[in-house]
């Protein structure tokens, strides 16, 4: 029995009533739970001998807005314009029937040498999650970062302030509906002799990635690419 198989067996035996989903893919074990079950699950994962997850190595927010939608919705590939890099795909957009936001935790057991991902989805209308700072001190800045970038509140955090943006920043820049160029920019005004906020003067534009073609313009007579 591998380490992951042992871990899955123990999770199913001990936490079946608290988790809503358990998956294993690419050598990673992931469990999902509801917000109200987060702390009981985390306490068990930290304190039970068979788990012994003594370290929280990462915590992040995720915004699933438009998850799985096509970036380029065009009917055909052309030699110019926005659709020139289109490749037809049989796969359709993913259907996600879960809340828009999620919080993801990565746990490590230095005793058992195994890892676990814990995920919980949070309703957009009530973006509040219990803090795990009292369980792992490393959660302090992780939770502040998730609050700053996504607007997720962590109930019980001792100092939930912005971490990466400045004090007067409005909004949460890692949300998918936040403008890429931002809302305002900060600059020094020589007349006022102070730093001010002003609307961004960046003109929105579409950036098309480099397209590598494999057609007759680049294929030699022998069927290989020309140097």
Curated annotation (Swiss-Prot):
GO-annotated molecular function: NADH dehydrogenase (ubiquinone) activity; NADH:ubiquinone reductase (non-electrogenic) activity; quinone binding
Signal peptide bounds: none
GO cellular component, one term: plasma membrane
Predominant place of localization: membrane
SUPFAM superfamilies attached to this UniProt entry: Nqo5-like (SSF143243)
Coiled coil: none
Known EC number: 7.1.1.-
UniProt keyword terms in alphabetical order: Cell inner membrane, Cell membrane, Membrane, NAD, Quinone, Translocase, Transport, Ubiquinone
Transmembrane segments: none
Pfam families hit by this protein: Complex1_30kDa
Task of the protein: NDH-1 shuttles electrons from NADH, via FMN and iron-sulfur (Fe-S) centers, to quinones in the respiratory chain. The immediate electron acceptor for the enzyme in this species is believed to be ubiquinone. Couples the redox reaction to proton translocation (for every two electrons transferred, four hydrogen ions are translocated across the cytoplasmic membrane), and thus conserves the redox energy in a proton gradient.
This protein's name: NADH-quinone oxidoreductase subunit C
